[in-house]
Amino acid sequence: MFFILLISLPSAFAVIGDLKCTTSLINDVDTGVPSISSEVVDVTNGLGTFYVLDRVYLNTTLLLNGYYPISGATFRNMALKGTRLLSTLWFKPPFLSPFNDGIFAKVKNSRFSKDGVIYSEFPAITIGSTFVNTSYSIVVEPHTSLINGNLQGLLQISVCQYTMCEYPHTICHPNLGNQRIELWHYDTDVVSCLYRRNFTYDVNADYLYFHFYQEGGTFYAYFTDTGFVTKFLFKLYLGTVLSHYYVMPLTCNSALSLEYWVTPLTTRQFLLAFDQDGVLYHAVDCASDFMSEIMCKTSSITPPTGVYELNGYTVQPVATVYRRIPDLPNCDIEAWLNSKTVSSPLNWERKIFSNCNFNMGRLMSFIQADSFGCNNIDASRLYGMCFGSITIDKFAIPNSRKVDLQVGKSGYLQSFNYKIDTAVSSCQLYYSLPAANVSVTHYNPSSWNRRYGFNNQSFGSRGLHDAVYSQQCFNTPNTYCPCRTSQCIGGAGTGTCPVGTTVRKCFAAVTKATKCTCWCQPDPSTYKGVNAWTCPQSKVSIQPGQHCPGLGLVEDDCSGNPCTCKPQAFIGWSSETCLQNGRCNIFANFILNDVNSGTTCSTDLQQGNTIITTDVCVNYDLYGITGQGILIEVNATYYNSWQNLLYDSSGNLYGFRDYLSNRTFLIRSCYSGRVSAVFHANSSEPALMFRNLKCSHVFNNTILRQIQLVNYFDSYLGCVVNAYNNTASAVSTCDLTVGSGYCVDYVTALRSRRSFTTGYRFTNFEPFAANLVNDSIEPVGGLYEIQIPSEFTIGNLEEFIQTRSPKVTIDCATFVCGDYAACRQQLAEYGSFCENINAILTEVNELLDTTQLQVANSLMNGVTLSTKIKDGINFNVDDINFSPVLGCLGSECNRASTRSAIEDLLFDKVKLSDVGFVQAYNNCTGGAEIRDLICVQSYNGIKVLPPLLSENQISGYTLAATAASLFPPWTAAAGVPFYLNVQYRINGLGVTMDVLSQNQKLIASAFNNALDAIQEGFDATNSALVKIQAVVNANAEALNNLLQQLSNRFGAISASLQEILSRLDALEAKAQIDRLINGRLTALNAYVSQQLSDSTLVKFSAAQAIEKVNECVKSQSSRINFCGNGNHIISLVQNAPYGLYFIHFSYVPTKYVTAKVSPGLCIAGDIGISPKSGYFINVNNSWMFTGSSYYYPEPITQNNVVVMSTCAVNYTKAPDLMLNTSTPNLPDFKEELYQWFKNQSSVAPDLSLDYINVTFLDLQDEMNRLQEAIKVLNQSYINLKDIGTYEYYVKWPWYVWLLIGLAGVAMLVLLFFICCCTGCGTSCFKKCGGCCDDYTGHQEFVIKTSHDD
């Protein structure tokens, strides 16, 4: 059994090691916890930073993300000093601490002088996971040695698979005295190491600094003994996560003051400043305070003056509210898991635990777990969580079927016995019990199987640890009965079916007898649908929470009253032991219902109920639901007696009822908002503005970053911190405007005079100064200069406004998939996406129709349209040639081509068989056909001639035979040659046939001998194959057992690799289709979004067109630059493609007059007047009125003024709206990716080869028999009589040869004409060496021939 240690469980780390190297001088004295330093991490001088991989940066500042300590964090002193005794509490938490991302250590170099030598001592540190010899531990241990009277310090670094002692410790230099021996690991064999190396350090340094962190399975180490910034030491890929670190106690007789200050590392952004020599001289933790964030925003240690929008802040909780229902009983899950009986997979058992408490650490300590992993939830979160209830299913695991239980896998267990629901939050526990403490129960849960005789005895004689599982499941209708009717002839015995069921059917066989036959032939597992009947036993797969509905049933084994089936009638099940190494393997599936909501809670991290703090931001844990919020007490009557939690429509916690006091509360989120930092370059810190938030809310809660608070006050913009309130005054220039007419002014003199302020003051910003005119009539609100137009010209502006657009409809399925069926089938899984797309486009088209109707209504009355402008462009496509795309078209494309060939140019050939006389006959005639009868051959005393005649011979013999028949008996002698010729040639045919017959007998005899030898060879081969088969079958059985062992560990192996590949190909194809669908749906979605945006723009432009029709075309607009450029005169409108075309005429100013104007005048100190549609202007120290559109001074009269009741001016400032340009703060990508791969458990493979039977084959006898058969075959050589092949040429007639001769002469004449009479002119006959001129001189050609013998 390969045991997997669950490092995620807190109880797994009771001590650092598990090997008891020593038990002497060990006690349980509590010496306290590690002390906390009064010094904090100050990163400004580089403390906690490092030179990244020793890279050099010159005279620059860099923003780097990495693992750094938090600025302002404290240290813990992890050093432990002993003399003789060690405390067991030293080797447990908090001294054994989580490593997480990494640690930064500040180690004091404790120097002790003895005998004139100054010794250097400090403790060793180890970093690892389980600290056993199956995992690597990193050890950094100091050692000193005296060389020539000088002390040399070494850092011995090793990364090895140490077996760590339970109480590890180191000792000081032997010269300082020791009462213990150094003992921190114990390994009898050679230790496997990845890294070993020694580094020197300065023994005179006051402090040493270490920087250890891990990232992506790689460990990084940095170190320095000079300065604060650490330098690269080494890095090493481990591939595992280091979980803990431990500073080993140092024992020494001498009085040493040890300090090993450690602070954790986390992912931070730092601003690092380097000088011209590449030395890091300043560092900033960007998230430590507001000033640091300003530096990082500007990438400068000395940021310039400005107003900076920071990343904001979140009010931090000031208290914790914890609620659990008290006095709940213990769930006692471990007792049920350790029960004396456990079910088989076929009849797996379930139990629900609710309204009780459980302890995961206690549970794991009571069972021997092989592995524990969770699906859709982090396993470590189970400690301290609450659930509505926990449902646990368990059963014994057959040894060969454990692989079936992997989440998402298939196989017998998950297909036909127990299906794991991957959609819910669940955890899978694999554990084992001793064989003596457990037995496996067998029970068939199928009601219809048990109705027809299946009981526990039907499983036969099974061992106490044999687990029964189904290999196929079958379901039947309620009316099913397997017994036949008595009217059937043949088959099994009759039976009486229960009431309400249907007896087995019969059908008329070929013999016309009523014969009984099974519905499912030959059995339901192999039934393929024969005859006209349908097998009522239908194969099914189970779903989560279902048992197998029934095993298969062979109906011919059922009979009796009532109908009962024999045990062997039930098929499709198997059994196998659950024992392995003397323990029974058991599977338990924890189904977690209503995660973080309920009264079934883990007590591992449970706390006591606290007081409910209201109206401030708090951390809450309410019956397992955790979060942050502000609790507001309300009087709610809508909770029922069994309800404690209230949710909103989005599924978020909205309120709760306290179980103890019955009080009800609403939950509001803690404030998270915008912060503006106002910074002046001459100041060392900024003033802050918490937008839209009162100071009482800011300081009643704890904000994210601590502030050196000087003063604060509420303003129109929000809470202002560290600035002086000076809103009674105003400034005309401001470098730090904050909006809404306010300014934060920095006054250096103010800070030097008033030490309680920061030099910032919050005041009004008025960038203008009113220059009042001394007059008996006083202007109201000041006197200002503006320009008023005095001369004009007529201008024209042509404007097009779109009021409609083409309608768009999309066939979504065709757009995405075309006509690809697989794509369309998978597209259906996307639900109503396509319907939604078309619905949106329909809404867009309806919106366009409505908009067009509104535009048309505005044009119906009072507007004359000009001739409609032609919309659209004619595009002629008739001349486009598509043949390059479509290829060749028409009947000419497939016409077959013809060719000529010269076959047997000179003669026609006829071949015939020759037994020896044809060649001699041919040699005798020499080609003279008249010598035919003279050259008669003799073959074994018989006169013979070849059975072949030429045309001339046929003519001659025919003429002779004809002459002999014309004038008998005078011409009878002329027929003698003919008759001899026929007889001799018949003899030739007979001789040839006789030779062929003799050869045929020889072939048959030799073939019979060969068959005997072949048969003997086959017998020998068969005997050898029988032996081979026996050995191969034995090894196949062994291999089958091995494959079963492998399948337990490596995954379900299909019947063939081709099936696996086909499934993988199908999955890959489906994944690729899904990617393509997603891509095309994204494009379609973007297009539809663009259509929505465009339709909105069209709607707005159409509304603008309607407004311009009403105001510009139907009337004269008083608005400047609305109907054209300038003051409107007249507008015309024309219809245009997809819109309206406007022509505006207006008069445009060409010259302006600068005038002094006032918004009003105050007469007699209490009566005010203001201009009506114009301005009051001061002309030559007298007040007059002029219109706003053109300069034309006229006296102030009652027609151009409005009388006011007072001269006072009410000032109102509109609030400013500023866009939040901060980037969303997304979670770390690595952390988010980690959520998908956490808590993955593995099962070690069992690669035992005990089942393989290695057998050697002895096939010598069979090989000898085969050799004898080969000899017989070799002796079956057939010596056939030679039958030659004679070729007889049939010559062509004389006129054919004449034509060939004439054609040759013509060709020679043509060649002479071409070569000698053309091409080179008349001079060709003058050349001796060739027919063509050679201007480079005569060249001789030497032709050499060679003959190969």
From Swiss-Prot:
In this protein, which residues make up the domain named BetaCoV S1-CTD? 329-603
Q: Which PROSITE patterns match?
A: BCOV_S1_CTD, BCOV_S1_NTD, COV_S2_HR1, COV_S2_HR2
| Keyword terms | Coiled coil, Disulfide bond, Fusion of virus membrane with host endosomal membrane, Fusion of virus membrane with host membrane, Glycoprotein, Host cell membrane, Host membrane, Host-virus interaction, Lipoprotein, Membrane, Palmitate, Signal, Transmembrane, Transmembrane helix, Viral attachment to host cell, Viral envelope protein, Viral penetration into host cytoplasm, Virion, Virulence, Virus entry into host cell
Q: Where is this motif: KxHxx?
A: 1345-1349
Task: Return the annotated site residues (Cleavage).
Answer: 754-755, 899-900
Domain of life, source organism: Viruses
The family database entries (SUPFAM superfamilies) matched by this protein are listed as: Coronavirus S2 glycoprotein, SARS receptor-binding domain-like
For the Extracellular compartment, the record's topological domain ranges are 14-1293
| Modifications the protein undergoes after translation, according to the UniProt entry | Specific enzymatic cleavages in vivo yield mature proteins. The precursor is processed into S1 and S2 by host cell furin or another cellular protease to yield the mature S1 and S2 proteins. Additionally, a second cleavage leads to the release of a fusion peptide after viral attachment to host cell receptor.
List the membrane topology term(s): Single-pass type I membrane protein
Outline which residue ranges sit on the Cytoplasmic face: 1315-1349
State the CDD domains in the record.
HEV_Spike_S1_RBD (cd21508), HKU1-CoV-like_Spike_SD1-2_S1-S2_S2 (cd22380), MHV-like_Spike_S1_NTD (cd21625)
Please tell me one Gene Ontology term that the record gives under cellular component: host cell plasma membrane
- Give the InterPro entries listed for this entry: bCoV_S1_N, BETA_CORONA_SPIKE, CoV_S1_C, S2_sf_CoV, Spike_N_sf, Spike_S1_NTD_MHV-like, Spike_S1_RBD_bCoV, Spike_S1_RBD_HEV
Report residue spans for region: Fusion peptide 1.
900-921
Q: Does the keyword Cell wall biogenesis/degradation apply?
A: no
Comment field on protein domains: Fusion peptide 1 (FP1) and fusion peptide 2 (FP2) function cooperatively and have a membrane-ordering effect on lipid headgroups and shallow hydrophobic regions of target bilayers. They are considered as two domains of an extended, bipartite FP. The membrane-ordering activity is calcium-dependent and also dependent on correct folding, which is maintained by an internal disulfide bond in FP2.
Q: Which family does it belong to?
A: Belongs to the betacoronaviruses spike protein family.
Listed HAMAP family? BETA_CORONA_SPIKE
Tell me, how does this one assemble? Homotrimer; each monomer consists of a S1 and a S2 subunit. The resulting peplomers protrude from the virus surface as spikes.
Name the UniProt record assigns to this protein: Spike glycoprotein
Q: Could you tell me the gene encoding this protein?
A: S
